Amino acid sequence: MRKLFTIDLKDYNPNDYERPSITSDVLLFSVSDGVQTNYRKLKKKYFSVLLVKRDRYPFKDKWCIPGGFIGMEETCEETAKRVLATETNLHNIFMEQLYTFDDINRDPRTRVISVVNMALVDKNKLDDTLYPKASWFNVT
């Protein structure tokens, strides 16, 4: 069989192209019951998102979704798992890739593309294991 294409990598220089930074972020949601005040009514449900307080600039001390830069030897999924473990102390969470955010000037440091994963968890089973800089916020 004849080859249609040949690749000659000696002429390829990766430094000829600008490269963006890529992050993997995780949107963790939970639905939980409120306090039942009337036995004749169903408990109120609360929809929450997990945020972490940033400890670095830019946006130091602001709340954000957990995320981090993808290492050269990591996949997006591996990075998401690492980020959840290091920033929230959560492990073995099933995630699905949700969306890729690629606005050009969304990060003041450099060009950043973010691959966002999503998960739905039972926060009542996780609250005791969370790190102090991670907190649930009700979505209204």
Residue ranges and their predicted role:
Residues 2-8, 62, 80-85, 101:
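Generic detector of short, locally flexible boundary/turn motifs and exposed helical patches
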Residues 57, 71-72, 105:
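Glycine-/small-residue-rich active-site loops that bind phosphorylated ligands and cofactors
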